[in-house]
Structure formats: C-alpha cells, structure tokens
Amino acid sequence: MRRAWSRGIGALIACVAFAASAQTTDFPNKPVRLILGQPAGGPTDIVARLVGQKLQDRWGQPVVVENRPGAGSNIATDMVVKAPKDGYTLLVGTVQQIVNPFLFSNVAWDPSRDLVAVSLVTKAHIVLVEHPDTPAKDLKGLIALAKAEKGGLSWASAGNGSTGHLTLELFKTSAGIDATHVPYKGTQPALADLLGGRVPVMFDGVVTSLPHIKAGKLRPIAVASLTRSQLLPDVPTMTEAGLPGFEAVGLATVMAPAGTRPEVVAKISADIAAILKQPEVRDQLVGMGLEVVGSSPAEFDSYVKDESAKWGKVIKAAGIKAD
C-alpha cells in the first residue's frame, strides 16, 4: 500500500513537472500584451512597438501594445502588478518604475518586490545644455559660475519630479552647487524659455535638443551618461568633463509580474536580446539617440536595485514629491 502511494505521488510530481516544462516550451501560445504608461508616438512607445513587432514575428503570436498613460505611469504599472503571473502581460517601463515609489505617497507597489526584471532594453542619453549667451563654455566653468551666483543659477525642467529635475538634484550634490529649479508643464515650454534666454540651462533629452544644438541655438556642455552619445560624438560625458561616475539616463525596460516562472522570464529576455542584435533594429534605435542594451534578467535586477538606492537618496534629500 505504501509503495503504491509513493508511486502515485511520484507520478503526480512527474506530471506536474512535465506540464510546467510544456508550458515554458510552448510559450507563448496566445497573444501577449505590452502595457506602457506613455502615450502613443513617444520614444518609449516607438521602442515598444518595434520590439513588439519583432517578438510577434519570432513567436508567431500577436503582441499587442496598450498605452495606459496617467498618474506618472502608475496606472499601467498597477495593471501589470495585478495581472496573472504567466508572462502574457508585460510592462514596458521607464525610470518611473524605479523612482515613483519615492515620488508618490500612494504607490503601493515596489519594483523589487512586485515586479520581476526581464530586460533593460535601451538607455536614452540626457545632455546638459545652456543658452549660448551663458558665460561658461564647459562643465568646470558652469560649476564655477553656479557657485558664484547667489542662490545658484536657474535651471529649467519639464516638471517637478521629471527626469530633468532628478538629474539636476543629483548634479547639485555631485558638483557641490546650489540651484533654483524652475519647473515647467512639459519639455517644450521649458525649451522655449531656454531658447529665449529666460533661463540659462537645463538637462534635456539628446533627441529633443539636437536640432537646436545643430542650429547653434543651444550649447551642449556634457552628456549625463557613462558613454558618449552617437548623435553628439564630440560632446564629453560628465566623467570626462570632471564628474567621475555621474550617470542619469532615460530607460526603456520590460518587466513582468513577480511570480512569473523564471523559465518564461529567461525566454522573453533572450528573445529580446536576439532582436536587439538585428542590424536594422539597432540602426533604428541608435538613430533615435538610444543606447542599445538588452540585458539579462539578473543584470537588470541588479541595475534596478542600484538605481533605486541612488534615486531614493536623491529624492529624499531634496524632499521631492510629485503628488
């Protein structure tokens, strides 16, 4: 009797293991949803649709991009956190999944607890730009100018808690300067006042600043990434300009609900990495001013933890709240 019971249990375990293996091998066998918190037409949306189309071609299953903007991407993130843990609902994230738990008092999720890292797809370079009439011509000169100015220089950003604002706060700490933050309702109004000379300096995405840089209407000082931008190859990094290790970048990522099977996560990540190696995909992303990454889940998980520690410290020290 005991032997029969043991054989029965063994057979049951084998069946469960086989079923789990089959689920992983067959993934995906139905449509996959890519949820993002940004509107259609923006850089993150373009990355999502490009990668989504390539995944669809590779998998032979529909990959549907769903834009759910609002509340600083919290709506989209909450949807994915609460979705079935099967890999069929994925989040196309940004740096907001890392910083929002510190910026918003009503965020109930934590990226390290409620989401699992799949892939860091791309990094978007940020450039420190100034109006050409600003006396400083390089980073050291700008830091000296900021220190000499009572209350610091005025810095524009796309809004309170925006990437530009957070980068400014990190820069203030790293450079040992003070600054007056001037938040706008979006990038375009901030750029308009920068171009008009009403504010002297700001951190902005390379892509949005590039036309004005080429036209001589803005002067690039340094990029806030660890590598130079291929769109601005002559502009130094912050490290090269005198602030070692300084990094602030935009992100396009893929995350899944915590509890998603590791085998499914590994498959999705590996397929994304393979897609990002395709020359036509790389060329399109680089042409958008993006740095192609395609990390493993472990690499991305480590990055999320490091960035959470860094930005949490910056946000708390500056007392920034977005709600």
State each model region's role.
Residues 29-31, 174-175, 214, 240, ...:
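An extracytoplasmic/periplasmic, membrane-proximal ligand-sensing/linker region
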Residues 92-97, 157, 187, 204-209, ...:
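Beta->alpha turn/N-cap motifs
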Residues 44-60, 165-173, 212, 275, ...:
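Short, polar/charged alpha-helical segment
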Residues 97-106, 170-174, 201-235:
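A ligand-binding cleft/hinge motif common to bilobed small-molecule-binding domains
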Residues 1-12:
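Bacterial N-terminal signal peptides that target proteins for export
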Residues 82-88, 102-189, 238, 251-284:
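Hinge/capping helix and adjacent helix->loop/strand transition within the periplasmic-binding protein
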Residues 22-113, 152, 160, 176-205, ...:
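N-terminal (or domain-start) structured segment
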Residues 14-22:
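N-terminal signal peptide c-region/cleavage motif recognized by signal peptidases
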